[in-house]
A protein has these predicted regions:
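Catalytic cores of Mg2+-dependent Asp-rich isoprenoid enzymes
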Residues: 3-23, 30, 34-149
Length: 149
């Protein structure tokens, strides 16, 4: 999508793909954490669990209820935050009229990220939701090139 639709050069495509991919993946992990862990899948990397003093080898359901899970989520979120910032910087430098779908997608995931960040990383349920009006606003923002990029 980055190279074909947005017509970025090879280097920009590779870097944006890496940054956007990381930001979106982490946002999804943080957004879906309860369902994933209840399904037996812990996608937060071990380094962040260890930094939050969550013991290695703990059962998934015990990680879900661990008092320090919010610390691991907050630290993991910093990686997404820096990826969003770098992606926005690169998009700003390489913006063209064909990059609007990329800007919209990044704005959408960033909006989910911001909802979680504002309410606090200790809150895992319910999953954040964007209202229809908010999604429409994000489309207009991308089309009119306001905010984000």
């Amino acid at each position: 999508i980055l190279k074909v639709i947005a017509e970025f050069d090879e280097e920009t495509t590779a870097e944006l793909g890496r940054l956007i991919g990381r930001a979106v993946e982490i946002t999804n992990i943080l957004k879906n954490i309860k369902e994933d862990i209840l399904g037996g899948h812990v996608y937060i990397p071990e380094e962040f669990l260890a930094a939050a003093e969550i013991e290695q080898g703990l059962a998934a359901k015990d990680i879900l209820t661990h008092k320090n899970l919010y610390v691991a989520r907050r630290k993991f979120a910093e990686t997404a935050r820096s990826s969003f910032a770098e992606a926005y910087r690169l998009l700003e430098e390489n913006h063209n009229r064909n990059s609007k779908p990329v800007v919209y997608m990044l704005n959408l995931y960033h909006a989910y990220f911001e909802l979680m960040d504002k309410r606090g990383w200790e809150i895992i349920s319910p999953k954040p939701e964007l209202k229809f009006e908010d999604r429409c606003r994000l489309v207009m923002k991308a089309l009119l090139n306001r905010g984000g990029c």
